[in-house]
Amino acid sequence: MLVQEQRERVVEELQSATYLGRSKHCNCGIYTFDGGRLPNLMHEVWRLRDLSYGEVGVALDDSARRCASDCDGSCRQLIVWDGAAEQIVGGYRYALGSNTDPQHLSIWRYYSLSSRFINDYLPSAVELGRSFVSPEYKCGGEHHRMYALDALWEGLGRVVVESDVRYLFGRVTLYPSLGVRARNLVVGFMRYLFPQREELVSARVPLRVGLSRYRCRKLFVGETIMENYRILMSLMRRMRRVVPPIISSYMRLSPTMQTFDAYANGDLGDVAEAAILLTVDDFYDGVKRRYLSQ
C-alpha cells in the first residue's frame, strides 16, 4: 500500500505520461511512459510487479526486479490507472521493433532470432514483455482480474493501431507451482495446436518437454481449438491444476498464433517460458472490434 507522500509523487508524474484515453470497458485511464523519465511511476510498477510475481512463488533477484531495460529507453510501460482509487490496476512492458536494436529486446538473451525475423517481422512488430495485475484487483475475484486484463489488452490495441503494428511477439510464462507434468502438458498443447510455421526464433537452451506430437495427437482429439482447450482443462483438473489465464488470453486472439521453443528462465526462479508470435490481420473479428476499433 502506498503512503500518501508516495501516492502524491506518482499522481504528479502521471501528468507527464502519454494518455491513450479511457477504457471502454471500465472507468480507468490508459497511459504509457518511459521508465527512465518518470522514476516514481517506474518504482511503483516495480513494486506491484514484484508483489504479483511473489504471489505465484517467484522471488525476483535485484537484476530481474529492477530490469535495466525498463529505464534505458528501449521499451515503454503501459499501465491502466484507477483514478478513483489513485492506483495502478495493471501493467505491460512493451518495445516497438521499429525503434529497438534486436540486441536490446528482452527476448534476445534467451532466443536466437533469424535474419528473416529481424528483417521481415521485427520492423512491424511489438515485443510484449512482463505484465502484471495489481494484487488489489486480483483479490476482488475473477471479475476484477478479467476487467483488468481486458483494459490492458485495450491499451495494447491502441498501441497497435497508433504504431501500425502487424505482429505481436513475446513469451508466455509458466510458473514452478504448476508442476512439471502440467507444465509439459500446456507447452505440448500450445506447440500442437499453435505450431511454428517457420523457424523464426529458437531458444538458445531449449527445454525438453517430453511430450511428442504423436502423444498430443492422441490426447487432443477435438475438432476445434476450443474443444481441445476443454480437453486440456479436463486433463489439468485431474492433476488439480488450472490452465494459466494468460494462455487463454493469447489463444483467443487468433487461430494462427505460432509457438516456438520453451526454455527455463533462471532469472525468474526457473519458470518455463515459450515464445509466441501473432499476426494482427489474423485476429478474430470479435477481437478486432473489441480492441482495435477506435
What positions do the PLM features span?
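Short acidic N-proximal helix/loop "leader" segments that mark the beginning
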Residues: 1-26
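Short amphipathic alpha-helix that is part of the acyltransferase structural core
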Residues: 21-96
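Short, conserved charged micro-motifs
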Residues: 40, 144, 284-288
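Acyl-donor binding region in acyl/amide transferases
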Residues: 50, 60, 97-257
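Short, well-structured beta-strand/strand-turn elements
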Residues: 56, 63, 255-265
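A short helix-loop-beta-strand connector motif used in the catalytic cores of GNAT acetyltransferases and
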Residues: 69-79, 257-258, 268-274, 286
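Long, continuous compositionally biased terminal/linker segments
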Residues: 80-81, 275-294
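Short glycine/proline-centered loop/turn elements that form peptide/ligand docking sites
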Residues: 243-246, 264-269
